[in-house]
Amino acid sequence: MIRLKIISSIIALLILVKGYSQNITNPFETFKKKKEIVYGIDNRRTHIYQHHTVIYGLYSGIGFGKKLRFKIGINGTPFEIGKFVDGNGFIKKNQLFFASLGEEFDFYQYKKFGITTYLQAGIGSNFYRQLNQNGTEVNKGKERIIPIETGLHFSYDILTYFKLKTGFGWRFVMPNNSRDLSGYYVKLGLGFNLKKFNETKTEQ
């Protein structure tokens, strides 16, 4: 149900901004723009089966015209997550680590407000432990995971070099034995552009 609501919200927002098509960027035009190296932090808060946690990420890649970015990243949960209980009463705790390829496209801009599409696919492992009801470890191992994340992100320019960022989306995890690791994610943070900050100081 939560997944359906998130996907429906994304579709509704895309339909809404279509009415302001004069503010929508053509993705093919951005390839003609100046290229640059991009890098940063890609943390997102998420919910994994009764457990609120954070997936931490670092990325680097190439950007076009400050609108379109292709990224390579590493992502993981340094702490064990999830509260899965099987038919034998064993608790399964999980620790994720995966590499990813993704894109971000700032397709809509109206004055200081912007909307960005987010799509990322990865491959990695879930390092898990199984504990009995007494907390004793009875099994451990790792499973292949293929997470795919998609969502919409929003930004508001507080200053030319300082912006508020937020967003939401859904993470699908394959294969079937890892589907319980799927869930929504939300992002909230601040963006600081050092280059624009230095340009502002130089102009002063």
Describe these PLM feature segments.
Residues 23-27, 47, 64-66, 103-109, ...:
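Outer-membrane beta-barrel proteins
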Residues 31-37, 66-70, 111-117, 160-164, ...:
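Outer-envelope beta-barrel architecture signal
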Residues 44-46, 83-91, 134-140, 173-178:
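Extracellular loop and loop/strand-boundary signature of outer-membrane beta-barrel proteins
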Residues 66-135, 146, 156-158:
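Gram-negative (and chloroplast) outer-membrane scaffold detector with strong preference
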